[in-house]
Amino acid sequence: MIIERLTGNLRDLNPLDFKVDYVDLEWFETRKKIARFKTRQGKDIAIRLKDAPKLGLSQGDILFKEEKEIIAINILDSEVIHIQAKSVAEVAKICYEIGNRHATLYYGESQFEFKTPFEKPTLALLEKLGVQNRVLSSKLDSKERLTVSMPHNEPNFKVSLASDFKVVMK
């Protein structure tokens, strides 16, 4: 089965009205536009998203819906550093340092709380900066992601040289 478009999200439906099968993804797999997966019930799924969400796939995104059957995304829990800032200045420092490492940053559950995937060097940096943090297991859902840039995107247009193209060296 090839999926080219998302058809909604489970949060907009009553999941009890449907037979729901899930595709379990790690947080870093949610930004894939082309991939193959197996559902929990063993169905082969291929995605080739034409209009992929800028932030990536989110918890509960519906890949397939037909009558009473749904195949949806489940983002697996992973080891995460929960960061609690004490001030706006500390928020700026956290965002700068995490961004400088090109690490992913997510909003947390409360104001001034952030999450980032666990990496020992990041944890050591936060300790060195004196930023309050703890390592927990939780979901990193794309809808809570602070950054939206997608590295190495392919252009959706064709480039060709004009017939009168010339290179002039001076």
Curated annotation (Swiss-Prot):
Q: Which UniProt keywords apply?
A: Chaperone, Cytoplasm, Nickel, Nickel insertion
The family database entries (Pfam families) matched by this protein are listed as:
UreE_C, UreE_N
SMART domains, alphabetized:
UreE_N
Gene assigned in the entry: ureE
Where is it located?
Cytoplasm
* Function of the molecule: Involved in urease metallocenter assembly. Binds nickel. Probably functions as a nickel donor during metallocenter assembly.
Q: Name one GO molecular function term.
A: nickel cation binding
| GO cellular component terms, semicolon-separated | cytoplasm
User: Which family, according to UniProt?
Assistant: Belongs to the UreE family.
Q: What is this protein called?
A: Urease accessory protein UreE
Listed InterPro entries: UreE, UreE_C_dom, UreE_N, UreE_N_sf
Gene Ontology BP terms: protein folding; protein-containing complex assembly; urea metabolic process
